[in-house]
């Protein structure tokens, strides 16, 4: 066990990034939090890099298009802001960029002339479908070290954490995640 390469890698990981902040005397939950944060940051940075290199697009634009892809009837810009957890100004800027590139369209909301409904255009749908397929391959690749049972167990454990957080946090905090 002493020469197990996975233990060497874990010891090395303890000294990287967020995890370097945790000392041996720190509570196990703090070390877990820092490992989750470090892992998430690594994955997010890699996805950002690949989206930029492969498609010339930011993660923010990808996430925006993903929300619209799920909403076949489009979304109000205020709904996009809430779902993406960004300001209305950020959504307006992204909408302007994506509309200029022909990836989204906006039209006045029938029930509220002050609101805009944003939808993916046919070009936007095709572009997002290609990106989403690549994105899924990347995520599968990044998690290739986990077998199906490990993925299911981690998914379940993180689901338990999410439920706990939703119950513990104030409604306004829980709704934004």
Predicted features, each with a name:
Residues 1-55:
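N-terminal leader segment of winged-helix/HTH proteins
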Residues 41, 45-87, 101, 173-177:
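N-terminal helix-turn-helix DNA-binding core of bacterial DNA-binding proteins
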Residues 55-61, 90, 121, 144-147:
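Short helix-coil-helix linker/hinge
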Residues 152-177:
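Exposed, interaction-prone assembly regions rather than primary DNA-binding/catalytic cores
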Residues 2-11, 15-21, 96-156:
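Charged, amphipathic alpha-helical coiled-coil/dimerization segments
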Residues 77-78, 89, 96, 116:
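Residues within helix-turn-helix
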Residues 34, 63-66, 92-94:
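Base-recognition residues in the alpha-helical recognition helix of bacterial helix-turn-helix
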Residues 33, 37, 41, 85, ...:
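Short amphipathic alpha-helical segments with heptad-repeat character
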């Amino acid at each position: 066990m002493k020469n197990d390469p996975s233990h060497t890698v874990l010891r090395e990981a303890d000294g990287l990034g967020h995890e370097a902040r945790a000392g041996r005397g720190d509570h196990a939950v703090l070390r877990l939090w820092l490992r989750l944060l470090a892992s998430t940051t690594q994955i997010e940075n890699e996805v950002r890099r690949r989206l930029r290199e492969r498609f010339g697009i930011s993660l923010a634009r990808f996430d925006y298009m993903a929300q619209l892809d799920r909403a076949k009837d489009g979304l109000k810009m205020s709904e996009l802001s809430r779902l993406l957890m960004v300001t209305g100004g950020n959504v307006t800027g992204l909408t302007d960029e994506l509309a200029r590139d022909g990836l989204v369209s906006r039209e006045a909301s029938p029930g509220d002339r002050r609101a805009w409904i944003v939808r993916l255009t046919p070009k936007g749908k095709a572009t997002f479908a290609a990106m989403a397929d690549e994105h899924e391959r990347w995520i599968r690749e990044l998690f290739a070290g986990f077998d199906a049972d490990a993925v299911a167990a981690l998914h379940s454990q993180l689901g338990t954490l999410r439920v706990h957080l939703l119950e513990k946090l104030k409604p306004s905090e829980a709704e934004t995640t």
